[in-house]
Amino acid sequence: MSASDLTSVQAGAPQGRRQILVTSALPYANGQIHIGHLVEYIQTDIWVRTMRMHGHEIYYIGADDTHGTPVMLRAEQEGVSPKQLIERVWREHKRDFDSFGVSFDNFYTTDSDENRVLSETIYLALKEAGFIAEREIEQAYDPVRQMFLPDRFIKGECPKCHAKDQYGDSCEVCGTTYQPTDLIHPYSVVSGAAPVRKTSTHYFFRLSDPRCEAFLREWVSGLAQPEATNKMREWLGEAGEAKLADWDISRDAPYFGFEIPGAPGKYFYVWLDAPVGYYASFKNLCERRGLDFDAWIRKDSTTEQYHFIGKDILYFHTLFWPAMLEFSGHRTPTNVFAHGFLTVDGAKMSKSRGTFITAQSYIDTGLNPEWLRYYFAAKLNATMEDIDLNLEDFQARVNSDLVGKYVNIASRAAGFLLKRFDGRVQASAMNHPLLATLRGAIPQIAAHYEAREYGRALRQTMELADAVNGYVDSAKPWELAKDPANAVALHETCSVSLEAFRLLSLALKPVLPRVAQGVEAFLGIAPLTWADAGMPLSPEQPVRAYQHLMTRVDPKQIDALLAANRGSLQGTAAAAEAGAANGNGAGSKNGKGAKAAAQPAASAANADDGASPIISIDDFAKIDLRIAKIVACQAVEGSDKLLQLTLDVGEERTRNVFSGIKSAYRPEQLVGKLTVMVANLAPRKMKFGLSEGMVLAASAADEKAEPGLYILEPHSGAKPGMRVK
């Protein structure tokens, strides 16, 4: 099936039994699964379950992405071999995916014999077709560790805006991309040594070949997402621009990965063998199940192949990967579906705020994984828009939709049916007009899921749940039960309610698979499929005793979850206690209450010039003070007090802070300075934007008598992200 056929396939009911291969991006094998990762795996799993319910032959394939310098160095830090590290991480990742109901048909590893053979086969086919070039390149080399340094293992001064401590491939301040050799005053993140320049032979995939450009211009027209199509056209440029650059697919030893055939000491770059890992995992499954692997991947295959990814890796999946497949003689993806990023409470995930939430901590805290599946699904659509996990809304939506609207229907009807009617529904009730409405909506809900419009599917489902609850409220079965003369009406009401509950459970099954299993057991029915919409409950099959299917979210669980993920705060507390034990704690030398007033978003609070109240070491340990570098600063339009600071706090992103220090500093005076900030202060929304912390400044108690405002500056040698303790 070609990419352009997708719309016609998704428009209505399934057109015959389709053969579909589906993947999610491979998680890297040097860290934990967090809720940002789970957005993609839950999104993919819902789609896969939808297609399984249509009866299609569909395989959901995954693997750990195991190769590269970061894994090699992480293993070294832990005192284990890379293979030992990736085996342990694989078990952790598999546990997390199982906990959240991510139903891989095979979850494998890229460090496999299948992947080695397939990577070599594809490489040699590309080489035979003239798509591999060999060149001498100059790279940064760590003379201490005697290794070439990947781009992200070099930092230095941006060659364009001169911001300090920028990575070797791009500047997080001005957005410029460049080569590591372009950095000013570079240093190795591994050893701290100044890299030297050294030449080495590398191997390139010739993406600039006119054949690649011609193929990609045609292939991009089939992408389902306009945002992806537009981005690809931007990368391709106009015809004749030749914007595509060749891609370096090799790395030098020492490196954890696959050695390139015929090139001793040279290894495939991880981004070559990682996507091949999709096929390797599927090949492993095919060998175990007796499937014809070649029939699925050969160029003339009529199967479908879909990749679900984050928008940050669109470049690899829509340029390199399809071109590699096309010119090595394999089928190309039917489509690539990209999603946006996850924020928590309107901000990027943060360890200091406890919102960098790992999958395991969510489970350990006792939260139901299907709560998160439902919430993410309610926010997801077919675009690359970012989604936000608002924890208050999460609690309210789960409690209202899933408990108040959905499972409440069964709890209101099951008891009466079991007690009064032996658990058997009334046959004539199955023809009620309300049920006809629900059955008529099921195909549209299924189509929404298939089109990845999960939010629409759930909105429609909850509207139907409202209608069912309205029916129950109007019929008042609790009142009918008081008079034996109302037995027929009571039987009808309970029967309609439970059949409606079955249909709502069918609509929710891709999102809530474990709840659906409980419903199937309760009703005594076979696993639900989309075809079952028109097969109502039968009086021949009594329902069983109702068991609670879902509980409400307790606010204390959310508090516990955030507390469990404040890893940086725990580290600060431990450091503070250690300092106190050595006579260097908070109360040792500065116990006179010297005033270092934190400057909040609007203005500094007035303070007494006497000593502040005595606090315990535990109180002090709650404050996460960090060294911050001011990488940008500007006046705030409409304010005579505020400056807007962009701070590097040693995280993966910069922070935005508004500070009332405009009277003391011009913006250009502050850029490049180090200061101290409160890193775990709750973000504050202002009319100018979101302030994500406070910088510290000193002033006299009587500012009129002693004017002056002075931000705190650490001695040279301090670096962004260091804790103040």
UniProtKB/Swiss-Prot annotation:
Binding site for Zn(2+): 158, 161, 171, 174
Recorded catalytic activity of this chain's protein: tRNA(Met) + L-methionine + ATP = L-methionyl-tRNA(Met) + AMP + diphosphate
Cross-referenced SUPFAM superfamilies: Anticodon-binding domain of a subclass of class I aminoacyl-tRNA synthetases, Methionyl-tRNA synthetase (MetRS), Zn-domain, Nucleic acid-binding proteins, Nucleotidylyl transferase
EC number(s) stated in the UniProt entry for this protein: 6.1.1.10
Enzyme class: ligase
Pfam families: tRNA-synt_1g, tRNA_bind
Cofactor, how bound (note): Binds 1 zinc ion per subunit.
Top-rank taxon: Bacteria
Any one GO BP annotation for this protein: methionyl-tRNA aminoacylation
Compartments in which it is found: Cytoplasm
GO cellular component: cytosol
Listed Gene3D superfamilies: HUPs, Isoleucyl-tRNA Synthetase, Domain 1, Methionyl-tRNA synthetase, Zn-domain, Nucleic acid-binding proteins
Residue span of motif 'HIGH' region: 27-37
InterPro entries: aa-tRNA-synth_I_CS, Anticodon_Met, Met-tRNA-synth_bsu_C, Met-tRNA_ligase_1, Met-tRNA_synth, Methionyl/Leucyl_tRNA_Synth, MetRS_core, MetRS_Zn
GO MF annotation, one: methionine-tRNA ligase activity
Cofactor: Zn(2+)
Family from the record: Belongs to the class-I aminoacyl-tRNA synthetase family. MetG type 1 subfamily.
Family matches, as PANTHER family: METHIONINE--TRNA LIGASE, METHIONINE--TRNA LIGASE, CYTOPLASMIC
Function noted in UniProt: Is required not only for elongation of protein synthesis but also for the initiation of all mRNA translation through initiator tRNA(fMet) aminoacylation.
Protein name in UniProt: Methionine--tRNA ligase
Organism the protein comes from: Burkholderia pseudomallei (strain 668)
Source organism phylogeny: Bacteria, Pseudomonadati, Pseudomonadota, Betaproteobacteria, Burkholderiales
